[in-house]
């Protein structure tokens, strides 16, 4: 069973383009990504799954606990080699997300977490996901909420992001490709992270960003708090229950008719 808590430190470098397990300094971002895999893994149970843009591979391996088959796809050759060596349950392939190297109607689920904001042609990619899904297949996608991730900006703060989305824009992108959006959810800080926000001047995120921008040593308390974050510290809440525009990350569950 995949367990990043017990994994050796990743052999892949931390570039800012992807998160990796096993690093105390990266743990907040890793857990914020991992929670969506954990909470939505049941949608992959017994199914043929493509993770389009699998990165380090920890998520594809987590999905492999329940799926019939997991295909991982990434454009970076070093990443593909890493996943092949580290996660043998994942059928890892090298390829471009703009032209998915799979036949039409060949998988039941496409997973795309924290990737679409890196792509230049998002509409082309979403159309490709529609193509490779079987009728009734599910597209699971997560992405930073533009409203809270890059507030008041026309361009993303993260230099690796090409275009960030708000909830309405994500829904429009999916529906234009032919998907029916079953649900939209938001990732929020739970009670424990709200306490850490208060401890670190109102935002544990901003505290980490300021340290990185200043290229300053880690404050001992900040590092300890970041290293202690767990997936249970995040809430994944339907848009019907909480204002989606206040969320940290957006999660959409879309179905190919």
Curated annotation (Swiss-Prot):
GO terms for molecular function: S-adenosylmethionine-dependent methyltransferase activity. Keywords: Methyltransferase, S-adenosyl-L-methionine, Transferase. SUPFAM superfamilies: S-adenosyl-L-methionine-dependent methyltransferases. Disruption phenotype: Inactivation of this gene results in a dramatic reduction in the amounts of 6-O-methylglucosyl lipopolysaccharides (MGLP) synthesized and in the accumulation of precursors of these molecules. Cells lacking this gene do not grow at high temperature (42 degrees Celsius) in Sauton's medium, although their growth is comparable to that of wild-type at 30 and 37 degrees Celsius in this medium. Its EC number is 2.1.1.-. InterPro entries: Methyltransf_11, Methyltransf_Superfamily, SAM-dependent_MTases_sf. This is Probable S-adenosylmethionine-dependent methyltransferase MSMEG_2350/MSMEI_2290. It comes from Mycolicibacterium smegmatis (strain ATCC 700084 / mc(2)155) (Mycobacterium smegmatis).
């Amino acid at each position: 069973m995949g367990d990043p808590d017990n994994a050796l430190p990743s052999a892949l470098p931390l570039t800012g383009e992807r998160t990796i397990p096993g690093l105390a300094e990266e743990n907040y971002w890793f857990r914020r990504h991992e929670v969506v895999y954990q909470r939505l893994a049941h949608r992959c149970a017994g199914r043929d799954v493509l993770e389009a843009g699998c990165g380090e591979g920890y998520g594809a391996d987590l999905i492999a606990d329940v799926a019939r088959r997991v295909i991982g796809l990434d454009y970076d050759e070093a990443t593909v080699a890493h996943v092949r060596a580290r996660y043998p349950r994942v059928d890892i392939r090298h390829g471009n997300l703009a032209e998915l190297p799979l036949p039409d109607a060949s998988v039941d689920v496409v997973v795309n977490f924290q990737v679409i904001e890196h792509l230049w042609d998002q509409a082309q990619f979403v159309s490709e996901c529609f193509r490779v899904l079987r009728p009734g297949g599910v597209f699971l996608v997560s992405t930073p909420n533009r409203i809270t991730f890059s507030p008041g900006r026309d361009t993303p703060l993260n230099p690796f992001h090409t275009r960030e989305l708000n909830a309405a824009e994500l829904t429009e992108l999916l529906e234009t490709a032919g998907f029916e959006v079953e649900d939209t959810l938001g990732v929020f800080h739970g009670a424990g992270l709200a306490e850490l926000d208060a401890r670190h001047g109102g935002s544990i995120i901003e505290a980490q960003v300021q340290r990185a921008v200043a290229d300053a040593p880690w404050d001992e308390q900040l590092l300890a708090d970041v290293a202690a974050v767990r997936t249970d510290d995040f809430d994944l809440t339907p848009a019907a229950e909480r204002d989606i525009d206040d969320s940290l990350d957006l999660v959409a569950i879309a179905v190919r008719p």
